[in-house]
From Swiss-Prot:
Its main location: other. The modification Phosphoserine is found at S314, S324, S326, S409. It comes from the Eukaryota. It comes from Mus musculus (Mouse). PANTHER family: CLUSTERIN ASSOCIATED PROTEIN 1, CLUSTERIN-ASSOCIATED PROTEIN 1. Belongs to the CLUAP1 family. Disulfide bonds: none annotated. Transmembrane segments: none annotated. It is found in: Cell projection, Cilium; Nucleus. Residues 185-308 form a coiled coil. Residues 303-413 are annotated as: Disordered. Required for cilia biogenesis. Appears to function within the multiple intraflagellar transport complex B (IFT-B). Key regulator of hedgehog signaling. This is Clusterin-associated protein 1. Disruption phenotype: E9.5 embryos are still viable but die thereafter. Mutant embryos are runted, have exhibit enlarged pericardial sacs, and defects in neural tube development. There is a complete absence of cilia in E9.5 embryos. Sonic hedgehog (SHH) signaling is severely disrupted with down-regulation of PTCH1 and GLI1.
């Protein structure tokens, strides 16, 4: 950026009717807001009907704005702009802005549109972008607050000017002592020389340190190369224990396979054993339930027979005590041997073996039927309950024979 370019740019913008005053100090530092406003104004001046977004809040928006301006000027005015310099928004952007302003300025001069330009200036004063004005308003408020703070500090400093003037006058009027000044200068020179010597020592140390580091690096490289060769040698040589290791590994794999097979067999056999125990338990419970049902049926049958026997005994005379005892012994001997033969009839694995022993003659049967008393019935009930609890395959069952019709009961007398 040159002073002449900046001056020409400000004069051209003033001649073109730019509403704001552009100072040569505006481009000392990057000022993207001013550059974007100038570019938008120049584009509107070149093509009033164009529509270019003026949002420059984010970095992406600024890049899009610069690209849109450059594309518009390249297609409409055949002016090639450097987008990088425009994005810098400093003195280098002025050269790119001059490309546009020079075209518009030359066109204004050649066609002699001074009068119309004055009218356009008046119109352009009222045509402004509201967004840019809001940004200017924020900047103006910030500047107003800064001006207030600086004005207060300036007022305080001006209040101290009287005292400071006297001190300043005394300092200026006081003669300088040459010896003291030389002493201070010598001290300063010594300090500078010490700093220079220290810097030189550091540079020398840097050179020696660099040589030492290079030697260490070279040594490390040699060690690395040596270790790499050693590693390759070790990898290429087969260890002596590898054959034995592979053999042991194969044996271990075989033992593991055998272990897996035996473990599966053991698990299967345990499952079968559990199933067998469960089936036995179910059979036992079924037999117990069947025995309980048969016991209940036998009790009901005995009660019914006792009731019918008591009714029949009312018509029959009781014989002598010794005969009744002998007949009682014969009746006990004539009972069935086992009770499981009746209870386990539904089970296919059990065979029912038993015999019903009757009397030797009709006379014995008649006497047996007539001599049943209540004591014998109670003993039979007790024996049946004891045998049902034992659940042994050979326990006797008490089957009660129904009394035959007493056709010859009158002949006993």
């Amino acid at each position: 950026m040159s002073f002449r370019d900046l001056r020409n740019f400000t004069e051209m913008m003033r001649a073109l009717g730019y509403p704001r005053h552009i100072s040569m100090e505006n481009f000392r530092t990057p000022n993207f807001g001013l550059v974007s406003e100038v570019l938008l104004w120049l584009v509107k001046r070149y093509e009033p009907q164009t529509d270019i977004p003026s949002d420059i809040e984010t970095e992406q928006d600024r890049v899009f704005f610069i690209k849109a301006i450059a594309q518009f000027m390249a297609t409409k005015a055949h002016i090639k702009l450097n987008t990088k310099k425009l994005y810098q928004a400093d003195g280098y952007a002025v050269k790119e802005l001059l490309k546009i302003t020079s075209v518009l300025y030359n066109a204004m001069k050649t066609k002699g549109m001074e009068g119309s330009n004055v009218g356009e200036e008046d119109i352009s004063k009222f045509k402004f972008d509201l967004g840019s004005k809001i940004a200017d308003l924020k900047a103006a408020r910030q500047l107003a607050s800064e001006i207030t703070a600086k004005g207060a500090s300036l007022y305080d400093l001006l209040g101290k000017e009287v005292e400071l003037r006297e001190l300043r006058t005394e300092a200026i009027a006081r003669p300088l002592e040459i010896n003291e000044t030389e002493k201070v200068m010598r001290i300063a020179i010594k300090d500078l020389l010490a700093q220079v010597q220290k810097t030189k020592d550091l540079l020398n140390n840097v050179a020696s340190d660099e040589a030492n580091l290079e030697a260490k690096i070279e040594k490390r490289k040699l060690e690395l190369e040596r270790n790499r060769k050693r590693l390759q040698t070790l990898q290429s040589v087969r260890p002596a224990f590898m054959d034995e290791y592979e053999k042991v590994e194969e044996d271990l794999q075989k033992q593991y396979d055998v272990y897996l097979e035996k473990f599966r067999n053991l698990a299967y056999l345990e499952q079968q054993l559990e199933d067998h125990h469960r089936m036995e338990q179910e059979r036992f419970e079924e037999a117990e339930n069947t025995l309980r049902l048969m016991q209940n049926k036998l009790k009901e049958e005995e009660k019914r027979l006792l009731k019918s026997g008591s009714n029949d005994d009312s018509d029959i005379d009781i014989q002598e005590d010794d005969e009744s005892d002998s007949e009682l012994e014969d009746r006990r001997m004539s009972k069935p041997r086992t009770a499981m033969e009746v209870l386990m009839q539904g089970r296919p694995s059990k065979r029912i073996v038993g015999a019903m022993q009757g009397g030797d003659s009709d006379e014995d049967e008649d006497s047996e039927d007539s001599e049943i008393d209540m004591e014998d019935d109670e003993e039979d009930d007790d024996d049946l309950e004891d045998e049902s609890i034992a659940l042994s395959p050979a326990k006797p069952s008490r089957r009660i024979r129904k009394p035959e019709p007493l056709d010859e009961s009158d002949n006993d007398f």
